[in-house]
Amino acid sequence: MSAQVEQLEFQAEARQLLDLMVHSVYSNKDAFLRELISNASDALDKLRLEAFRNKDLDPRTVDTSDLHIEIEVDKNTRILTVRDNGIGMTRAEVVDLIGTLAKSGTAKLRQKLHAAKNLKDTAASEGLIGQFGIGFYSSFMVANKVELLTRKAGETAATRWSSDGEATYTIESVDEAPQGTSVTLHLKPEDFEDELHDYTSEWKIRELVKKYSDFIAWPIRMEVERRAPATSDGEGADGEEQVTIETQTINSMKALWTKSKDEVSEDEYKEFYKHIAHAWDDPLEVIAMKAEGTFEYQALLFIPSHAPFDLFNSDAKIGMQLYVKRVFIMSDCDQLMPMYLRFVKGVVDAEDMSLNVSREILQQNRQINAIRRRLTKKVLSAIKDLQAERPQDYRTFWTQFGKVLKEGLMSDSDNRDTLLHISSFASTHSDEEPTTLAQYVERMKDGQDQIFYATGESRQQVMNSPHLEAFKAKGYEVLLLTDPVDEVWVGMAPEFDGKPLKSVARGEVDLESEEEKTAHEAERKEQEQNFAGLVNWLKETLSDHVKEVRLSTRLTESPACLITDAFGITPALARIYRASGQDVPFGKRILELNPNHPLITGLQQAHENGGDDTHLRQLSETAELLYGTALLAEGGALENPAKFAGLLADLLSRSM
């Protein structure tokens, strides 16, 4: 006997999201069956793992003797049921499942879905559904009503959930139900134009299982009709066929990672990737490997073609599954791949490891650490091959995952050289095409022994920075690094191919040849003499802001710029450290002056001429404005915008 039925409303945002997903997102409605089978497979994996780890499970309430997935159809009522006898769910977990839709029903997801729809980007929109983990609701594409009945293994109470996909759903406790979960779909009528097929048809079910779920490790069973002609012993009179019902397993259950690459079709790899990654895009690269010797294991890895929405979330998971002798152990096994390769999806099947292994044990496991090192090198090698042999695919990869891969330049010193080789960067060499460091080195000017780079928030900001002026004038290529991670890794990767990496905004800049230095030596000494008074006065006047004032060799157009010591912390890097909770003291920088700029020569003349108190005050205000404009020119933020605006207004008023 069931308890009272509780009827609840979907949140308004959840209704909008469900409606958008069902009617606008999926281009292929057949995919609903893959989602349901994938969920059932996960439930069976979890129960088998629990049985390995907990030997005290009560056999009266937990049955692991015949774990399987069952598909049942009723042609007359047009009902399709997908059933498993896996781990099942409690009422609280069912409510949380409903909450998944509500929690995923955010403005962010809806905006992305709308954008993908408007751009007619089917792969992107379907990918979002897999990423947000709400594929269960794809059932409403083909069904007018969906019912879920579930009982947690080891529990006695069951739960029934039901909805028509509109405004409400119902949930109730049920006294009796088999272990596991069944999802029952009351199918919509067939509609050829809307691509609604007959999902009660045996051949259609077989087709979809073969296409999407043939590799599932659990048997997928279905009752099928077998017809035989009438026999001569009188049975089947009047020429009627004999109809028998038999249960058949309709999937092969062969683990793809145990096969050699030439035994697996491209489509099989694609569907397996979509299954384990809960993704809708095709993989960009498939990596199959088998290791023998001290540590034996097989691995099947995939590099996606699209970045997941949560790639940069602090709680982003590593999409690696661990098996031991074909037995599922855990998903999201973060010990199998470094965090900077968290976009890689795949399976590792080890031969010599305890089935009772836990995440805590894995952290100290020598075999896992060795596997991790080998997998890392294999993935990086595959990316290197993409770069050399399939440049367009590499470009796609770098666009999607370049930012996260560069995290490895900070954290993985063992593979830093490889990472530097497979990384690409924007540069002043081309507005469109990124460059590798090896290509940069090939183009270096005669006598150049450093790789120059500039950091900032955008290409436009960096290109307009005064720090680049001398480099542009003399034709030196500069890398344009605009990702936040760039500020950090450049300090940890000091050189490439024996060439030091040099910031255009740090320390001294020396771009002149020996001949040029000799020719300009007299002029430089004269300038230092002429501007000595101004330099000393500015250092004193701006002592709250700068530690030093000097003439610049990097400026050709701007009057001044701010630079950091060769080993100092840039303001952008300081902001990153502070955002992560580190206490970084304010560091004064160096103000460089362009001795050939009219503003600087005019300021020098005004300082040399002297004057009354009003004149000196106005001169000091001009110095403050000079500092502020240098800060703004590099994309920095003013310490006191109101004060700067007031000084600027006064100056403009005097010039009227």
UniProtKB/Swiss-Prot annotation:
* Record-linked InterPro entries: HATPase_C_sf (IPR036890), Heat_shock_protein_90_CS (IPR019805), HSP90_C (IPR037196), Hsp90_fam (IPR001404), Hsp90_N (IPR020575), Ribosomal_Su5_D2-typ_SF (IPR020568)
Query: Quick one: signal sequence residues?
Result: none
Q: Please, which domain of life does this record's source organism belong to?
A: Bacteria
Ranges for the region named C are 576-656
Check the record and name the CDD domains matching this protein. Answer: HATPase_Hsp90-like
Question: Keywords for this entry?
Answer: ATP-binding, Chaperone, Cytoplasm, Nucleotide-binding, Stress response
Major place of localization? cytoplasm
Q: Which Pfam families match?
A: HATPase_c_3 (PF13589), HSP90 (PF00183)
Q: Which GO terms describe its cellular component?
A: cytoplasm
Region B: list its residue ranges. Answer: 360-575
Where is the protein localized?
Cytoplasm
**Which residue intervals make up region (A)?**
1-359
- Which Gene3D superfamilies does the UniProt entry name for this protein? 3.30.230.80, 3.40.50.11260, Heat shock protein 90, C-terminal domain, Histidine kinase-like ATPase, C-terminal domain
Q: Does the keyword Transferase apply?
A: no
Write out the function statement from the record: Molecular chaperone. Has ATPase activity.
What protein family is recorded?
Belongs to the heat shock protein 90 family.
The cross-references to NCBIfam families, in alphabetical order and at most eight, read:
PRK05218.1
Oligomer status and interactors: Homodimer.
Entries under HAMAP family matching the protein: HSP90
Q: What is this protein called?
A: Chaperone protein HtpG
Biological source species: Mycobacterium leprae (strain TN)
Ranked from the top, the taxonomy reads: Bacteria, Bacillati, Actinomycetota, Actinomycetes, Mycobacteriales
